[in-house]
Structure formats: structure tokens, C-alpha cells
Amino acid sequence: MSATEKAGHTFLASLGKTRLRPGGVEATEWLFSQSQLTSNSQVLEVACNMATTAIELVQRYGCTVYAIDMDKTALENARNNVAAKGLENHIHVMAANANILPFADNSFDVVINEAMLTMYADKAKAKLVAEYFRVLKPGGRLLTHDIMFTAQKLGAGEQGQLVEVVKSNVSPMTRQAWRELFLNCGFEQVLQQNGDMSLMSPRGLIRDEGLAGAIKIVFNGLRTSDNRRRFLKMFRFFRSQRHQLNYIACCSVKGK
């Protein structure tokens, strides 16, 4: 598959990017701060990708994580990364469909799902969130990390460019619409943080990947003509829309 055909996160991963979330480490750290995790916690990570977040959770809290994805390459990378850290007893990597989770009701203390809900239409978002609600224990927390409109939806032209840039039917919402999504699915409380997207900004790249990592990504992004066209197209679009698009991190609490 050429650089121009890959999904946005797959293309960035091929350049060496390890933080594939719109708010990078800033948003993920905020989610961690809201998690109330302990070594006894049972965690489900949906769309685990290469298991970067799952590994950090276990290293920090000593919890047990079930890391699921549908992409075979992502699962292979996740298993390799978990094995490299010697964390196979703490992280269980498996293929599973987020719409029909293979877990009983009230199974997890925390469900974490970063940069996935944005990729679905609003009705599909609600179906996924309802499934996360089902498997959470009473008092459990859903931690999500997505893209939001800062004021109103993009114009048709800009929305079309966004879909073209990331090669996915991206469907962000406003801050209030994200809140209402979780409340309407039964959550009792929704805490939120939003900020500048770090995915393609120079400052965000350095913060998320380190200086050497950022240099490597930019070098790989400019190295071939296909990569260069795709990389610059993504960079220019997100830069032009930096005031209209933010990351949003939400901690939604299930009632006891």
C-alpha cells in the first residue's frame, strides 16, 4: 500500500511515530490522572494499536490490561512490544470487536479508548459507548481521547479535506456534544479537558516523541516523493485548522 492510500495513523506509524493520538502525551497523562487505578484494577483498552498505552499503564500502576484490536498488524506489533517488556502476565492482547465485546457485564474498573470514537458516525459512537458502559463495573471509568470542534462543524469543503487527509470518515463533535453522548448512554458524570492537537505540530512532535524521534519522523516524512506529498498535506491541513480542531479527553463515570 502506498503512502497516499494508508490511513492517517498507519502512515504516521510507518514514519516512526509512536504517539498516534490527537492530543499526544498531554491528553493521555490527563486520562491517567483521572483513572484511579491500582495494582488490583482490571482494565480494557479498546483499539490498543501497538500497546503503547497498555504498557505504560502496567509499568505505572501494575494493573491487569486486556488490550484488544481488530487489525492483525497492530495486534502483532502489540504482542511483540509487550513481550519485549516482559509484561505478558499483565497484558493480554487479543482480537475482539468493540461492538460486541467478549466480556461479561461489570467486568472492568476502567475502559480506555483513544482516537477511535471520532472515526464513527454519531449513532455508531453511541452503540460503542453503550457497550463500554455494559462491561464497566459500577463506579467504573471510561477514558476517551478524540477530536472536537472548538465552535461549530467544519464547512463541507474543510470536512472533505479532513476525511481525505486521514483517509477515514472522521466525525468530530463539539465539547458539549461529546458530553451529551456519554450522559445519554447512562454515565453519571463527565469530566473533560481539551487543547491543541499535537499530532503534526512541531512542538507536539518534540513533546510526544523527543527531539531525536521528531527528527526521525520528519526525515522519513520527507524522504520519498509519496511520503513528502502525504506528510506535507497532513501538516498543512492541521496547521490551517488548528483553531477549529482540538483534542478532547473525557473521563465518564458510571454510577454506583
Predicted regions and their residues:
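Conserved alpha-helix/loop element of class I SAM-dependent methyltransferases that forms part
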Residues: 21-39
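A short glycine-rich, Lys/Arg-flanked "PGG" loop and its adjoining helix->strand segment in the class I
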Residues: 126-141
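Conserved Class I S-adenosyl-L-methionine
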Residues: 191-256
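Class I SAM-dependent methyltransferase SAM/SAH-binding core
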Residues: 44, 50-100
